[in-house]
Amino acid sequence: MPPYRSRTTTHGRNMAGARGLWRATGMKDEDFGKPIIAVVNSFTQFVPGHVHLKDLGQLVAREIESAGGVAKEFNTIAVDDGIAMGHDGMLYSLPSRELIADSVEYMVNAHCADAMVCISNCDKITPGMLMAALRLNIPVVFVSGGPMEAGKVVWEDSVKKLDLVDAMVAAADDHYTDEQVKAIERSACPTCGSCSGMFTANSMNCLTEALGLSLPGNGSTLATHADRKRLFVEAGHLIVDLARRYYEQDDESVLPRSIATFSAFENAMTLDIAMGGSTNTVLHLLAAAQEAEIDFTMADIDRLSRRVPVLCKVAPAVSSVHMEDVHHAGGIMGILGQLDNAGLLTTSIPTVHSETLAKALDHWDVTRTNSEMVHKFYSAAPGGVPTQVAFSQERRFDKVDTDREKGVIRSKEHAFSQDGGLAVLYGNLAEDGCIVKTAGVDDSILKFSGPARIFESQDSAVLGILNGKIKPGDIVLIRYEGPRGGPGMQEMLYPTSYLKSKGFGKACALITDGRFSGGSSGLSIGHVSPEAAEGGTIGLVREGDIIDIDIPNRKIHLAVDDATLAERRAEQDAAGWKPAEERKRKISTALKAYAAMATSAARGAVRKLPD
């Protein structure tokens, strides 16, 4: 049996000094020998998705100690992508994922912790902690802060649901008065929690359920609802049990790499495609798979995208449906149940809470079980009261939405689309692939051709859109915004929001080697690989070049002959792969260090050290 890692610092005469320090943290004689569990929190007052986590770490810690473990809490950083959006702050968002993963590794290995409970929530925090968990491969349970309630505003004598994107779109639309914009702004984000649609944060928290590393309901139970407290209480007890099974019973099946296997990654990506998740999840799953030493690639994502239907449409794809509605329909277990019915999942694999995913679905899928507890759990409703307090309300719907024909979650037979919610496109513009969230693309523009309007940065693209330089039929091309070229691979939520505000949501396309917010919709193609800074063809496009986009056939083509491209490449090699226009962008030492090691989006934008 493997010894408890913590014995390195708690046993033996030579560890008297270390034990003295442990005692100064509150440990007593009877604690030496118990599993030491790291409570990896991410509380910060900067981020609404994390503002309520301060007390939740201690809640988990108390449950760990009541179950016979020793809990030691620390915090990681957390960047709010919405606040960092639209300025140089966004350069730091994706690199923060690596910093979070490293900081978890540093703390856990430096102090020889035996296991972890990861309390995450927003965009880069869950992926960073996931990467660390698979890197360390010690028992872990994920429990996130939960989604925000959707905002509501009275508009033209009716109640309209809102989210963060509505505020951005309205602010750029001259048809809205200042008073209307303020009303939307004040109502869009009413509570603590991760932004209310199927944006990156909620997508990733949902995927932890499919990977088997979190409890049912983790991705969909509202941050404000009292039911969410149970997840934190159970996580504290569960992690002590997992630690004992591994260290005392030599049960390796509880380790994250035994749970998050290749099949589990397939399940997670299948879920992502079916629910129209954020394109950022592709980056994060690819990165996490590399930490787990699993050969899960863009080719696998392409393969899955061709056979998985869209079973659930959530904001930004459908403005009236938010995470609270997904939970009301049975949550992630409800979607996984329909995917299983369609034969699209591997359910023989374990989870942290069940022997197999199949057994978990039998217990938690509301269309399979008559359990009053399960149906009550998924009837949790929004409270409708602005608050930053977790577990502060107990409202419920009268019954769960089990309609799989016209409800929020559909069966394969009644899918929103038999074609998946994400697609990988290949062609001479993206030899290693690029990603489009097809769930947010109108059917009328699944095939699109138009002239490229070149912008060497997100900033210049925003100015171009707002100043009327884009017209219907154009393709906005933003380059040198990849992991290395940005650096940091900025999200392009403002350009897509402004195109929508100008009425071009179905009339233009946007292509970039950067990435998109989970809140983006429309014909938005990102993650173009190789990126411009790596010598990708996107760096050779000239103003007015025609680009052909064919989503049904998974193609993207720059209509320039090979000989001309070769001439341009020779010119660019001589000039250097850098933006044609100087950018007023201060690149710090920290960002330069990230850029020096960053790989392309096709590899998850992970760092690669020189040989």
UniProtKB/Swiss-Prot annotation:
The modification N6-carboxylysine is found at residue 124. [2Fe-2S] cluster binds at residues 122, 195. One of its GO terms (biological process) is isoleucine biosynthetic process. Binds 1 [2Fe-2S] cluster per subunit. This cluster acts as a Lewis acid cofactor. PROSITE patterns: ILVD_EDD_1, ILVD_EDD_2. Pathway: Amino-acid biosynthesis; L-isoleucine biosynthesis; L-isoleucine from 2-oxobutanoate: step 3/4; Amino-acid biosynthesis; L-valine biosynthesis; L-valine from pyruvate: step 3/4. Homodimer. This is Dihydroxy-acid dehydratase. It comes from Brucella canis (strain ATCC 23365 / NCTC 10854 / RM-666). The lineage of its organism: Bacteria, Pseudomonadati, Pseudomonadota, Alphaproteobacteria, Hyphomicrobiales. The gene is ilvD.
